Design a protein with these regions (language model features):
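Short, acidic, metal-binding catalytic loop of nucleotide-sugar glycosyltransferases
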Residues: 34-45
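A conserved acidic beta->alpha catalytic loop
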Residues: 52-60, 105
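Hydrophobic helical membrane-anchoring modules
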Residues: 1-14, 161, 185-252
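Conserved donor nucleotide-binding strand/loop of the catalytic core
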Residues: 49, 60-93
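N-proximal low-complexity "stem/linker" segments adjacent to membrane-targeting elements
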Residues: 1-35
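Short beta-strand/loop segment that forms part of the nucleotide-sugar
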Residues: 20, 44-55
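Acceptor/aglycone-binding surface of glycosyltransferases and processive sugar-polymer synthases
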Residues: 75-77, 81-89, 109-194, 221-230, ...
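Short beta-strand-to-loop acidic/aromatic patch adjacent to the donor-nucleotide binding site
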Residues: 95-106
Length: 252
């Protein structure tokens, strides 16, 4: 794993780091970088660390040329491991909060203060929900709306008795102190893909941490343009299996 030099943007009451995760997002990561740089002009107290999961399409070159700090995986390991890398960096470098966001231009950096505002109010984990009033899900395919608005929250309710409007957004803020709880094992070998975030959510719920949702945007590209690497059915199962495995005691 190659670590490029990190320079903090400035000091703030909470040390906050934004971590987009990326794999083969050429044509999209450029837009993420532009939006991040615009955001940082008005919010210089935030830091950034991009995690590139060994992209092979030139995304790494774009990130390198951007001047933003980044970590490069030497081999592709999966989105879950990329998130773990971001979390480990945040914890090891004494950040108070990490914001995880997509590297495919579906999330808007300008909405990050909504997440942080609820953290500052005392919450430990804040989810950006596309389905709350004020949120949006432009161009989202119908079947994905059904899955993310109804099926995913139902599974969460079934296994934890907690209700949320959006549990598959991938855009959230979490206190690093939560991530250092010994009951949360970030090194579980079975967590390599999208189930990593579901594992975190399950643990945060069942350990009694304070969770909030805020309106957020999840913007999909126009029809005909590739919008996800997740495969229907198998990808959804990878996301949801963490709740069943943990609830049934099959995994820790």
């Amino acid at each position: 794993m190659a670590l490029k030099k990190m320079e903090e943007m400035s000091a703030s009451a909470l040390r906050i780091i934004i971590s987009p995760v990326c794999y083969n997002e050429k044509g999209k990561i450029e837009k993420v970088i532009v939006r991040l740089k615009e955001f940082l002009k008005s919010k210089p107290g935030f830091s950034v660390m991009i995690v590139d999961d060994c992209s092979t399409d030139g995304s790494g070159d774009v990130i390198n040329e951007s001047g933003l700090p980044y970590i490069l995986h030497e081999n592709q390991q999966g989105v879950g491991v990329a998130i773990r890398t971001a979390i480990e960096y945040a914890c090891n470098n004494n950040f108070d909060v990490i914001v995880i966001m997509a590297g495919n231009n579906k999330d808007l950096p300008i909405e990050i203060p909504r997440l942080i505002g609820r953290i500052e109010e005392g919450n430990d984990f804040v989810i950006g929900s596309r389905f709350l009033p004020g949120g949006s899900y432009d161009n989202t395919p119908f079947y994905r709306v059904i899955a993310t608005r109804y099926i995913h929250p139902w599974v969460v309710w079934l296994t934890t008795s907690k209700r949320f409007t959006d549990t598959a957004t991938g855009f959230h803020a979490i206190r690093t102190s939560v991530l250092q709880n010994p009951e949360i094992n970030l090194e579980e070998e079975w967590l390599e893909d999208y189930d990593y975030e579901m594992y975190l959510l399950y643990k945060v719920i069942t350990l009694g941490y304070k969770i909030a949702e805020v309106p957020a945007s999840k913007i999909y590209p126009p029809r005909g343009i590739s919008y996800t690497k997740m495969k229907p059915i198998t990808g959804w199962w990878k996301m949801l299996r963490a709740f069943f495995f943990l609830r049934l005691g099959l995994k820790k």
